[in-house]
Amino acid sequence: NADAQIATGSNNSSRYFDYYFKDIPHIIRRNRSSVAIISGDESRDELLELGKDIFTYFGLGCRSVTKVYIPEDYDITVLLEALEDFKELSNHNKYANNIDYQRSVYLMNRVVFLDNVASLFRENSEISSPVGVVFYEKYSELNVVREELVKRKEDIQCIVTNEKGFYDSVLPGQAQSPELWDYADGID
């Protein structure tokens, strides 16, 4: 018998944990990812810092950025070219296999995507992307993005941005370096 339980798993397994541990105090961790918001005014150095937030630990983990919001008129090649500095990741066999697999699936299904060797970029409204893929979504107003992220708060670990007014936000390059008091899911 235990006084409390802590469990981690997928969104699906968390449903079972919630049921199984319903009568005792518990903390259940679910799938989460991090997102970034680009204003279009970022320097190359800031984009490289964002690259650390995307590619550190091969994009695995709740603090890894799996989705980037970009302005409607943003030239995404600026981001892609900056992130080419991480192309050495494609020399890692298992990471490269993920990119090759996703590229094959996208080509066979005629899905539009961009490729900068380090990763594939696909326009998609989902938060979590497969390993080797970064989703992006265009926005016209930051307030709309802000509202969307509040609605999806349960799916988001942190937000990487220079913009003000976003909950749990960190500057580019800081997603993988939480403070001691940055509790996962906000639970101590």
Predicted regions and their residues:
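Short low-polarity hydrophobic stretches
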Residues: 5, 38, 71, 145-146
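Active-site phosphate-binding strand-loop segment of PLP-dependent enzymes
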Residues: 2-15
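Residue-identity detector for glycine
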Residues: 9, 40, 51, 59-61, ...
